[in-house]
């Protein structure tokens, strides 16, 4: 696929023009001032990532994509992993965050750095710089904080921030800890401005109030107008935010969501979302995206747009090798090429996870089968048939497969060699109905 290295190759006159076309900017400071900053000499910009979980998610991915666009244009990125703010957590729309132990937060911070470093360039003239706000916040006394930082914030302005206002009007209210978050984030921007002449902050649209805290602070104490812009919040089909606190997170860490499942998330997006997702989540040129969108309208059954989207985003996050392995595993699973025996155990477990059944305790598990068990019994256990007689009829009609091999004998039993990686046997009914049993 034709990747681009900057906005000109993508078919745009300026970087800001490209970001706006891709729908990557929700709100910003004065557009002319922002355009002048982005189109001039390289600037230093930053985005903050709080380690409130062990992984980033696709809501954060939008920020990383924006950072990557700016990095490709020659600007200098700073990734702030919030060692201090991560101990507090920014206020949510509802409910206080659980405070995590310091050692847990520190471990999560290291994991986030590794994820970010896998996406942004870590070498070269504009390599990403990692900083932690714990380094300049932890040593600050309460008196210093109140005198040097807090003195510059007006309570009326702080109370008017959207999230704060909502929380104040709710039953649970808001703690002083979370209320103070915007002051800490504002101080972060000031520190990075002083230390690295950082003049632009990026964030999600739900962070607008926190971003403008730094904007106002720098204007007040340094007399300089800096810039901020936010990206839109990604939502699911019901309009709910995709995020780690919403229970349906699409994680970027391969140990928390496998590349296979990550790929499946993108390839299963509906046609109506193709234009916005291809624009926002890929680096394909404008002309190629427009072609794919048109193709999805005229030939939706081909699903070229979905396949391209899934490949582009998964390879961006997990690399091409892991993405190809996920595609090969999917093809092998349905007998569309590839060899089931070539899939490693970790990938197998991930691929087959959706074929678990609910046991008597309400747990999702793989049904158990052993060498010597009949295939028809294993197929029933996997939920493919309601009775042995139904399974027998399907075998007679040639519609039952064990590891993609048609079953001819109604009394065939599972052999040791039928368990892939020594654990899983895949049973298929027809072309699409799949089940799996585990030897344990």
UniProtKB/Swiss-Prot annotation:
Provide the transmembrane region boundaries: none
- Where, by residue number, does L-tyrosine bind? 46, 181, 185
Q: Which GO terms describe its biological process?
A: tyrosyl-tRNA aminoacylation
Motif 'HIGH' region mapped to chain: 51-60
List where in the cell it is found. Cytoplasm
Molecular function, one GO term: RNA binding
Q: What's any one GO cellular component for it?
A: cytosol
Asked whether the UniProt record includes Electron transport among its keywords, one would answer: no
Ranges for domain S4 RNA-binding: 373-439
Reactions catalysed according to its record: tRNA(Tyr) + L-tyrosine + ATP = L-tyrosyl-tRNA(Tyr) + AMP + diphosphate + H(+)
Task: Keywords in alphabetical order, please.
Answer: Aminoacyl-tRNA synthetase, ATP-binding, Cytoplasm, Ligase, Nucleotide-binding, Protein biosynthesis, RNA-binding
Question: In chain numbering, where does the motif 'KMSKS' region fall?
Answer: 241-245
Q: Which domain of life is it from?
A: Bacteria
Which positions does UniProt annotate for ATP binding? 244
Q: Does the keyword Transferase apply?
A: no
| Catalytic activity, EC | 6.1.1.1
Q: What class of enzyme is it?
A: ligase
By sequence similarity, the record places it as follows: Belongs to the class-I aminoacyl-tRNA synthetase family. TyrS type 1 subfamily.
| Role of this protein | Catalyzes the attachment of tyrosine to tRNA(Tyr) in a two-step reaction: tyrosine is first activated by ATP to form Tyr-AMP and then transferred to the acceptor end of tRNA(Tyr).
Matching entries from HAMAP family are given as:
Tyr_tRNA_synth_type1
NCBIfam families the record matches: tyrS
Assembly description: Homodimer.
PANTHER family assigned to the protein according to its UniProt record, in alphabetical order = TYROSINE--TRNA LIGASE, MITOCHONDRIAL (PTHR11766:SF0), TYROSYL-TRNA SYNTHETASE (PTHR11766)
In Swiss-Prot or TrEMBL terms, this protein is called Tyrosine--tRNA ligase
């Amino acid at each position: 696929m034709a990747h681009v290295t900057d906005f000109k190759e993508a078919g745009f006159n300026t970087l800001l023009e490209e970001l706006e076309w891709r729908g990557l900017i929700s709100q910003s400071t004065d557009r002319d001032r922002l355009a002048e900053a982005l189109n001039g000499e390289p600037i230093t910009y930053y985005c903050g990532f709080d380690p409130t979980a062990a992984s980033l998610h696709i809501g954060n991915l939008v920020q990383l994509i924006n950072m990557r666009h700016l990095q490709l244009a020659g600007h200098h990125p700073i990734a702030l992993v919030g060692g201090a703010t991560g101990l507090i957590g920014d206020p949510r729309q509802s409910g206080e965050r659980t405070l995590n132990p310091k050692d847990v937060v520190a471990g999560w911070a290291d994991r986030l750095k590794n994820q970010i470093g896998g996406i942004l360039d870590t070498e070269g003239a504009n390599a990403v710089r990692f900083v932690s706000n714990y380094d300049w916040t932890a040593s600050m006394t309460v008196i210093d904080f109140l005198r040097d930082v807090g003195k510059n914030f007006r309570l009326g302005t702080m109370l008017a921030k959207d999230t704060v206002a909502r929380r104040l009007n709710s039953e649970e209210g808001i703690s002083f800890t979370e209320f103070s978050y915007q002051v800490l984030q504002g101080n972060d921007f000031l520190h990075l401005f002083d230390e690295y002449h950082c003049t632009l902050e990026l964030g999600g649209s739900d962070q607008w109030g926190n971003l403008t805290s730094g904007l106002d602070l720098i204007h007040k104490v340094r007399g300089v107008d800096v810039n901020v812009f936010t990206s839109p919040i990604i939502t699911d089909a019901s309009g709910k935010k995709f995020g780690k606190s919403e229970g349906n997170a699409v994680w970027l860490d391969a140990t928390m969501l496998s590349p296979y499942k990550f790929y499946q998330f993108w390839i299963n997006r509906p046609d109506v979302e193709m234009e916005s997702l291809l624009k926002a989540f890929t680096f394909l040129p404008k002309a190629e995206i427009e072609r794919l969108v048109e193709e999805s309208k005229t030939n939706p059954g081909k699903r070229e747009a979905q396949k391209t989207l899934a490949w582009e985003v998964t390879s961006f996050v997990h690399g091409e090798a892991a993405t190809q392995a996920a595609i090969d595993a999917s093809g092998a699973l349905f007998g569309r090429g590839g060899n089931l025996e070539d899939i490693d155990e970790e990938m197998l477990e991930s691929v087959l996870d959706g074929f678990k059944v609910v046991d008597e305790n309400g747990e999702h598990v793989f049904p158990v089968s052993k060498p010597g068990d009949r295939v028809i019994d294993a197929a029933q256990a996997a939920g493919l048939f309601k009775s042995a007689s139904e399974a027998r009829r399907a075998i007679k009609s040639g519609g039952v497969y064990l590891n993609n091999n048609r079953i001819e004998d109604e009394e065939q039993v599972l052999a040791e060699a039928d368990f892939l990686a020594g654990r899983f046997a895949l049973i298929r009914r027809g072309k699409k109905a799949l089940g799996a049993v585990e030897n344990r």
